[in-house]
């Protein structure tokens, strides 16, 4: 079966199943190309919550499909690759988070959406990289527990006088980008702004001309007068950046910026998931209800 035939078959199955295909910005190019909606975690969470489709095919990693199930329990949520996990999400367990909460009674937990449903259920509010600063600024408490990403937490702490108790988690892919590599690239390309994701190491973030979520990168690069950019996030973002800005050049800050989990999902996987209507991700009600409370609090914060 050719790729074009496969794409046509997927489109036909999507229609037949009354399904919507959501793809994260880090997916393979060909998967993003057939998606009904591409976006970051926040954008896709919002789409999952409001879609009229009966079936959500989530091309991303496990915690994203869980979020869709939490927000739209009446929908069937398919995750084409059940083994597409997130190492950072796995760095925080419910038991360990409960221990931290017990040591810091009354301190609210802000959890990055890159976490399991069970961890979200232990949290007061969730955030994404797109709204994390706003979420923390909306809180009246003077101290917060922030999990699981220490790098995102360090970045948000710059914009508030709150005391942060940071979980020691991180994204292995973003952590691979080293400051010395960025310095060399900036020296070699002085006309190119360095745009990076807040999941990068703080020493890398310090070198950035602009720090933002993947959606923020699309907006920034589109509006900027610059013609060349150094991009500090997962390689999958380049597909849409190049498509939306054909007259601009994008330099990936490092060839190491590839997430193996995000690259697992193929067109064949999407086709099989739709054909067989599995694997299904369904969050149990005892976890879903408290997790939804944390996500709803996040979604209630006004967007720009």
Swiss-Prot record:
Question: Which BP terms does GO give this entry?
Answer: 'de novo' NAD biosynthetic process from L-aspartate
Which cofactor is essential here? [4Fe-4S] cluster
Give the SUPFAM superfamilies listed for this entry: NadA-like
> Does the entry feature the keyword Aminoacyl-tRNA synthetase, yes or no?
no
Binding, [4Fe-4S] cluster: 86, 171, 259
Q: Might you report a single GO cellular component term?
A: cytosol
List the InterPro entries hit by this protein, alphabetically. Answer: NadA (IPR003473), NadA_sf (IPR036094), Quinolinate_synth_type2 (IPR023066)
Keywords assigned by UniProt?
Answer: 4Fe-4S, Cytoplasm, Iron, Iron-sulfur, Metal-binding, Pyridine nucleotide biosynthesis, Transferase
EC supergroup of this enzyme: transferase
Q: Its catalytic activity?
A: iminosuccinate + dihydroxyacetone phosphate = quinolinate + phosphate + 2 H2O + H(+)
| Free-text remark on how the cofactor is bound | Binds 1 [4Fe-4S] cluster per subunit.
Task: Quote the record's binding site residues for iminosuccinate.
Answer: 24, 41, 112-114, 129, 197-199, 214
- Highest taxon of the lineage: Bacteria
Q: In which pathway does it act?
A: Cofactor biosynthesis; NAD(+) biosynthesis; quinolinate from iminoaspartate: step 1/1
Gene Ontology MF: a single term? metal ion binding
Alphabetized Gene3D superfamilies for the sequence: NadA-like (3.40.50.10800)
Enzyme Commission designation? 2.5.1.72
Q: Where in the cell is it found?
A: Cytoplasm
Please give the function described in this protein's UniProt entry.
Answer: Catalyzes the condensation of iminoaspartate with dihydroxyacetone phosphate to form quinolinate.
The UniProt entry's sequence similarity note says: Belongs to the quinolinate synthase family. Type 2 subfamily.
The protein's matches in PANTHER family, at most eight in alphabetical order, are given as: QUINOLINATE SYNTHASE, CHLOROPLASTIC, QUINOLINATE SYNTHETASE A
Q: HAMAP family annotated for this entry?
A: NadA_type2 (MF_00568)
Protein name per its UniProtKB record:
Quinolinate synthase
